[in-house]
């Protein structure tokens, strides 16, 4: 016995599924719309047809209830799925808005950096010329020419805190001329001239390209000069013991205060150092030569003439006689005002 569906029954159909318009609506409106369907044991809107027995009416009621429960479960699942999609869409919209804001900030920063780059390119010392770029494209095997090294100009004394390179003007390239480099190389490779005089060490004159070279004296000469200068000077009438032997005392014991001998007994030889002429605390820059053997020393004589009538000195005679010379030097000292 085939059973036909009752006209009052509401079987499940695809029309019960939410439409795209319902999916676009909020979850609140959808929940309000389905409240009437979610009420359990709600009375049927369609009455039973006439001519049915009680058993058939119970079967029809059970079928309607199953259909309503199945439709309710289906709508609930679909609603939960749509709610999840709606929450994911809202989260994606928030992330999209955040990304759009970040993109706007990056575009603003990119525009600012492009403006700074356009202002810096004309004065940048590291910029590669266009000819070098074209040469690299045409001849890839040639070596890359290095850009010139720019030396910023030194700051003037009026502006000690002035920067070397300003943003408005490029640095000035000042390579040294080739003639100056060659001249400096020749001057540096040339050895210093030999020292011909043992007395004074001469240094070359000042040059605009090379500072004067100061050659220190040998350490032995410095030590010897320091020792000679530290020695106290001898008396005026006695020459230095290094160059003249000690003089024998005068037999008459003439006046030491009137002795006119203030110079050494022998003429100075080249390189001779006299302690009398060396000031204390100053070391001369020359090398002394060894003392020469002195010849036989000259002799100093004195002769006094006294007046037999008076006990006073009438005249005195002091003379010096050299062994190799017969001439002598005589000094007269009159006494008592007599002619």
UniProtKB/Swiss-Prot annotation:
Phosphorylated by host CDK2; this phosphorylation greatly reduces the DNA binding activity of MEQ. It comes from Gallid herpesvirus 2 (strain Chicken/Md5/ATCC VR-987). SMART domains: BRLZ (SM00338). One of its GO terms (molecular function) is sequence-specific DNA binding. Residues 145-160 have a biased composition (Pro residues). This is Oncoprotein MEQ. Residues 57-120 form the bZIP domain. GO terms for cellular component: host cell nucleolus; host cell nucleus. Residues 1-80, 145-172 are annotated as: Disordered. Its main location: host cell. Residues 85-113 are annotated as: Leucine-zipper. Belongs to the bZIP family. Jun subfamily.
């Amino acid at each position: 016995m085939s059973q036909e569906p009752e006209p009052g029954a509401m079987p499940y159909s695809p029309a019960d599924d939410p439409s795209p318009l319902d999916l676009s609506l909020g979850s609140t409106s959808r929940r309000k719309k389905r409240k009437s369907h979610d009420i359990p044991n709600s009375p049927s809107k369609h009455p039973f047809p006439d001519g049915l027995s009680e058993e058939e009416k119970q079967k029809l009621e059970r079928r309607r209830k199953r259909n309503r429960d199945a439709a309710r479960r289906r709508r609930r699942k679909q609603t939960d799925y749509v709610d999840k999609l709606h929450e994911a869409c809202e989260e994606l919209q928030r992330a999209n808005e955040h990304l759009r804001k970040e993109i706007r900030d990056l575009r603003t920063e990119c525009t600012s950096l492009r403006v700074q780059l356009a202002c810096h390119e004309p004065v940048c010392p590291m910029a590669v010329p266009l000819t070098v770029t074209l040469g690299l494209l045409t001849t890839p095997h040639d070596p890359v020419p290095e850009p010139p090294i720019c030396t910023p100009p030194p700051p003037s004394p009026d502006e000690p805190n002035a920067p070397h390179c300003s943003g408005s003007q490029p640095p000035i390239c000042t390579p040294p001329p080739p003639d100056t480099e060659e001249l400096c190389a020749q001057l540096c490779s040339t050895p210093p001239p030999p020292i011909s005089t043992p007395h004074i060490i001469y240094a070359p004159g000042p040059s605009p390209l090379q500072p004067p070279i100061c050659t220190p004296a040998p350490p032995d000469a410095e030590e010897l000069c320091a020792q000679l200068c530290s020695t106290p000077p001898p008396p005026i009438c006695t020459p230095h013991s290094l160059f003249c032997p000690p003089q024998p005392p005068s037999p008459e014991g003439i006046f030491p205060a009137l002795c006119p001998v203030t110079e050494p007994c022998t003429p100075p030889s080249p390189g001779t150092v006299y302690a009398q002429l060396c000031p204390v605390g100053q070391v001369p820059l020359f090398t002394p030569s060894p003392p020469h053997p002195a010849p036989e020393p000259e002799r100093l004589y004195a002769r006094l003439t006294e007046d037999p009538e008076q006990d006073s000195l009438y005249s005195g005679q002091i003379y010096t006689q050299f062994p190799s010379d017969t001439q002598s030097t005589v000094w007269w000292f009159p006494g008592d005002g007599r002619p």
